[in-house]
Amino acid sequence: MLTRYKMTMAYDGHLFHGFQLQPDQRTVQGTVEDALKKMTKGKRIIVQGSGRTDAGVHAIGQVIHFDYPGKEIPANRMILALNSMMPTDIVFTDCQIVDEDFHARYSIKGKWYRYRLSLDYFVNPFKRFYTGHFPYQLDLEKMRIAAQDLLGKHDFTSFAASGGQIKDKVRTIYYINITKDEKENEIVFDFIGSGFLYNMVRIMVAALLEIGNERRPLHDLRRVIAAKDRQEVRQTAQGSGLYLYHVFYDEIPQKYRQDQYL
């Protein structure tokens, strides 16, 4: 008998070599699978994630699932057991027993990524692993206007880093919000979409920064999208500022459907 568990987790990614299991490297998937192996006295339980965050990238709302053998453990006990075995840079925040047709990756309706960018002139030693850094002049209003050109369904080849294995580069961006956190002297970017290509959020942030810094024309992203050429945006924002914030398994709420008003 197998019981499928859906679990939401947060992790500080700066000491992990990404989410996905890699030989002889510290990864999020490997850490969780090691704990499950101890719980089952040596059985390999494969953990499926909603996506593969890169080295140094963080998560507030990563979702995983796995099939646990033997007697069903109540969800409240499973989360206690796993959290007791996690290092201090991982915590599980929710646990549910779900039907076997639920899949952490293939049941997704959308994802929400957040990017935090420090505007401090010098790199803050307490932020260096948790924000990007851009100590230059930025026009936020221009960035907000330019971001509207990314909304909707497009081929995002120009915003996909080489090395990605997915051939279909068409994605839908539902929502983009760019705000200033005056207290922290940071800009916060929020992106909600049907899915995101390899490094896509970080490349979009880099392009918007070029517009905000007046190194790229206001509506140049329309041309960039049409070009379908990665060389059109050569910069990629630092991974330290990126957070997988939330994964949607129900329809995207209407308040996040800016694409419907284009």
From Swiss-Prot:
One of the record's GO molecular function terms: RNA binding
Q: Which UniProt keywords apply?
A: Isomerase, tRNA processing
Keyword tRNA processing in record: yes
Pfam families cross-referenced by the UniProt entry: PseudoU_synth_1 (PF01416)
Q: What is its EC number?
A: 5.4.99.12
Q: Active-site residues?
A: 54 (nucleophile)
Spell out the InterPro entries in the cross-references: PsdUridine_synth_cat_dom_sf, PsdUridine_synth_TruA, PsdUridine_synth_TruA_a/b_dom, PsdUridine_synth_TruA_C, TruA/RsuA/RluB/E/F_N
Answer whether the UniProt record assigns the keyword tRNA processing to this protein: yes
| GO biological process terms held by the UniProt record | tRNA pseudouridine synthesis
* Function, as annotated: Formation of pseudouridine at positions 38, 39 and 40 in the anticodon stem and loop of transfer RNAs.
NCBIfam families per the UniProt record, alphabetical: hisT_truA
Family, similarity comment: Belongs to the tRNA pseudouridine synthase TruA family.
What protein am I looking at? tRNA pseudouridine synthase A
Q: What is the lineage of its organism?
A: Bacteria, Bacillati, Bacillota, Bacilli, Lactobacillales
